[in-house]
Design a protein with these regions (language model features):
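Acetyl-CoA-dependent GNAT
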Residues: 5-12, 16-105, 116-118, 122, ...
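Conserved catalytic-core motifs of GNAT/GCN5-like acyltransferases
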Residues: 132-134, 147, 152-169
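Conserved glycine-rich acetyl-CoA-binding loop
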Residues: 99, 103-117, 124-126, 130, ...
């Protein structure tokens, strides 16, 4: 499936996860992160089903999508999933962002900011006063976003992504 319109100016909405979203979310995760950092279907499913999990999905509204139908391409207007966030609250004290995934072609359109702020509000409504996350030390776009949202680096986690011998920053924010 190919998105034919220019995403940067697209309208989008954020909604709760539905089980029918799973395959799309997994495919987005595979596109966003290299093998060894991206999650298996089993891992992703366990995060979504975790007790007190929050999974929010960003959909681009009324996008023109090219679909192959009986051998020919057809343009269809549809809402498409362009990103998601998964988090959970721990004993209703603090939250953890497990993953934030935005399709490469949908980045810098505000989806990450909106998903994170909506997720933080949900965590706060569950009683969380802080939220934590980890991100690769070389993931500059994520670091810029998280700093813009008020996250601070707490410490470096050596070889957090062991399959890539890559360190991560643990970051936190008070809600």
């Amino acid at each position: 499936m190919k998105v034919a319109s220019h995403i940067a100016g697209a309208e989008f909405s954020v909604r709760d996860y539905r089980p029918t979203d799973f395959e799309t979310l997994w495919r987005i995760d595979q596109r966003c992160f290299p093998r060894g950092i991206s999650y298996s279907q089993l891992e992703l499913n366990s995060f979504i089903k975790k007790r007190h999990a929050i999974t929010l999905v960003a959909e681009l509204q009324n996008e023109t999508v090219q679909v192959k139908v009986t051998g020919s391409d057809k343009n269809v207007i549809s809402d498409i999933i362009a990103g998601f966030v998964i988090a959970h609250s721990v004993r209703h004290k603090y939250g953890r962002i497990l993953t934030l995934d935005i399709l490469p072609e949908a980045r810098r359109a505000g989806l990450g900011t909106r998903l994170m702020t909506d997720c933080e509000q949900r965590l706060q409504s569950q009683g969380c006063t802080e939220v934590y996350l980890e991100t690769a030390v070389n993931n500059e776009p994520a670091l810029r976003l998280y700093r813009k949202l008020g996250y601070e680096i707490l410490r470096t986690l050596p070889e957090y992504y062991a399959s890539h011998s890559l360190d991560a920053f643990q970051m936190a924010k008070r809600l």
